[in-house]
Every structure is written in C-alpha cells, then in structure tokens.
Amino acid sequence: MMLTITTINNKTYYAFYSTRYEYIVLNDLNNKKFIKVIDSNGHKNFLQTSVIENVEVDASKDALEKFEKRAEVSN
C-alpha cells in the first residue's frame, strides 16, 4: 500500500508498506513514532508521525509502481 502523507506545514511525503504490515503501520501513525518516507523529490527521510495531518492510502495493484516512480525522481 502506498501512503501519501500531508504534514501540518503542508509538505507531502510518500511511503510504501506491504499490506500484511498495515496494522503495524497504522499503529505507528497513531503512537507518535518515526516512519520511513520519501519526499516529493525522491529523497529518503524519517518523518515524525506527530506532524502528520492527513494520510491517503492507495492499496491498488499498481501502488508499488506509482511509489517506485516517486522514488526515481532523485536518481
């Protein structure tokens, strides 16, 4: 599943997780932890979940392909 994350300062980040880890990811989002993300330029980073304002989930078949295209931006 690909996550499109918007923060309180209006920045957008992306993350990809296997759907079998969905419960763990959603639990981390609610417990003020850090998650691995890429920014809109494709750079890898860690994001503190307390700054997240909105999360959109894409669980479609082509979600991984969409995420890989985002990750290729910096390469």
Q: Can you annotate each of these PLM segments?
A:
Residues 1-11:
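A short beta-strand micro-motif
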Residues 9, 28-29, 56, 61:
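N-terminal regions of proteins, emphasizing targeting and processing segments when present
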Residues 10, 15, 22, 55-57, ...:
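Intrinsically disordered, low-complexity repeat segments enriched in small/polar residues
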Residues 16-51:
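Acidic, low-complexity, intrinsically disordered interaction modules
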Residues 37-75:
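Short, mixed-charge low-complexity intrinsically disordered segments
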